[in-house]
Amino acid sequence: MARINTLYMIKNAGSGHIGTSFSSIDIVSWLYLNELQKPESSIYFSSKGHDVPALYSVLISLELLEFDLIHKLRKIDGLPGHPDIKIPFMHINSGSLGMGISKAKGMVIANRLKDKKQNIFVLTGDGELQEGQIWESLQSASNNEMSEITVFVDHNKVQSDYQVSKTSDLGDIESKFKAFGWNVIRCDGNDFISISDSLNQSSNISNRLPTVIIADTIKGKGVSFMEHTAITDKSRYMYHSGAPTNQQYIEASDELISAQNILLNKLGEPELNFQEVPLTPLQVSTDKKISLMKSYSDALIDQADKNPNIVAMDADLILDSGLIPFKESFPDRYFQCGIAEQDMVSQAGGMALNGLLPVVNSFACFLSDRPNEQIYNNATEKTKIIYVGGLAGVIPGGTGHSHQSVRDIAALNGIPDFIMIEPYNEVEVQAALDFCVNNWESSSYIRLTPLPCTLSVDYEVSDLHIGKGTTLVDGDDIVLFSYGPNTLEQAVQASQILKLKDISLKVINLPWLNFVDINWLKSVTEKVSHIVTLDNHYRIGGQGDYLASKFINFKDSKKIQFLKLGLDNIPECGTNEEVLRAHRMDADNLAIDIENFFNGSNI
């Protein structure tokens, strides 16, 4: 049943992680049915986090979460796309990989100081074992005899879209864990008897060392065409993330229901009875949508054709980074680094020192933060590296705050001689990459949104003029600066709302996140006294802060009224529309706040 409900939750949400949810669900089910009856004495959490639909499904089945939440995965005020401690039985926030064992160690220390006895079960992924923090966390757990910790490795052999062995082979992981002083047990993680035997074996160990149970599992277990064993070793696994098509959903549901009913018949129990829920139809727009990732992918190949020193790197995100065409075109110049961002960035540093031009790709949230020190170190060597951060900004909102990159501008702002750009449309993506490759002498950061977008105002630009922007909507009363298609589209729509109220809002696309041409800035604002900035980022540390620091030096700065819009709180999880509305970044709320600002009211 838990797999059936998990499948429904992901289909209804429109996105999620089926493969890892299905590989881990038997482990989670067994733990909750047999080991976790008393939360004060035993707890469980997932370090990898993206398997959380399976955990939600188990908790709902045991009536530990309200049943109606089954309809609210990745919805506002519902169940986040990655674990969040605001939800009952979520003991840590996860989604950013590698932190779970360290969190468990901290809990053990706190429990010991408070004379509290509690067993802690942690689930990690096998791809997650490529993160350096995992290995940093092991030795002291053994040295301090933290037998309270039992780690399950969901060893489903596939990370994201490809086999672990083809991405960054783990080698003999049993010997590796033993070398760090851990007890090591192996089991079939999709077989209850094997899981039970491994836990019984663990409980009978007399030493005080922590234990790792390497659970061999099948990614997508339970649905034949979703199981990773159905693909060849060179094929891409198709069910890591996203949602199944209608036909895939019907076929998968039928297979799961049939298997469950066969078991119930053997037990003499009635077959399953289901409540039908209408499928929410997808809102398909007839408007032309732009794809910045597709444009980036094409532009990178074009630049690589001209420059043999360009190499591309990514951290287990070849599909999301748009690099499959690059790998096919330049197989010898593509480097898959696995889930190891710090190592990837330092490798890029070595490549740059020896004359290559690395283009380093990952999600913006992971690329800007985890290897931040390595990026700075590379910059001190005065080499040239291009960093490309995808999944930037507050939407898509379904993944939750671990993946919503809303502090990357601030995180990278202190890097010397470092330019940051967020393009607005497809042509500007090409121009941005061309600028970074051919016109900027040091390192750079291109910030990209993955969402196909519809733009009310579009334009073509042959090249970028550093520090200068483009007016999308002309206006006389207020000037608004922003960047990227998501916030600028909302700003353009807000200008149309304000026009009906006789407020004229000029909307300017300024793709330069940490640089502005002062003379240009003066020229576009000289006739207004009200300035607004809109960041797809926290207000602190974003483009708005940078521009405010420039306006302070203007001779007539005391006459300028300045409003910074953006995020103040941890990003909400939900649909894109829900998330923008929750943070007052949608057109309607922007229009209200800008009108109040113009009229002298507090917002």
Task: Give, region by region, the residue ranges found by the protein language model.
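Thiamine diphosphate
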Residues: M1-F121, N261-R447, P452-C453, D463, ...
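Short hydrophobic segments within beta-strands
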Residues: S47, L123, F152, M313, ...
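Short active-site segment of divalent metal-dependent hydrolases/proteases
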Residues: L129
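Residue(s) in the substrate-gating loop at a strand-loop-helix junction
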Residues: D126
